[in-house]
Amino acid sequence: MNTAYRVWDGEQMHYWDDEGLSLIIKSNGDWTLKRLYTDVLVPVVDSTNRNAALMWGAKVRGKFIYDRSIVKITSDDKESSDVCEVKFSDGVFQVDVSKISADYDVTAVGWVEYATIEVIGDVYQNPELLEGVK
């Protein structure tokens, strides 16, 4: 079984399905991302790197979404849209939908039935997408 994850090494994002990657997690929670080079696993980054981040993902509506993803949510009538940061909280991926919904402030990503959700980036590689967003 493959579990979707991505790792930010401070400069580049590495995804679970990148060729040759192997994620090793110790019982104490420490982790190391390694890449296979000529039959040898070579460390790429690990949890001791202060710029590194390990993020788990889930497939929602056919697209992988991760903690700290940036999404554009557009109402079904296409009259309003909002750019939001996805946060993993209480076991679910959540977004603030208060600007496009009178009924909800924060909702689980899978429950956004009245709108289209498009992953447009993440806070590591595209922080400018959140400029001006409250």
Curated annotation (Swiss-Prot):
Q: Which domain of life is it from?
A: Bacteria
**Cystine bridges: which residues?**
none
Q: How does it assemble?
A: Homodimer.
Q: What is the protein name for this chain?
A: SPbeta prophage-derived uncharacterized protein YopX
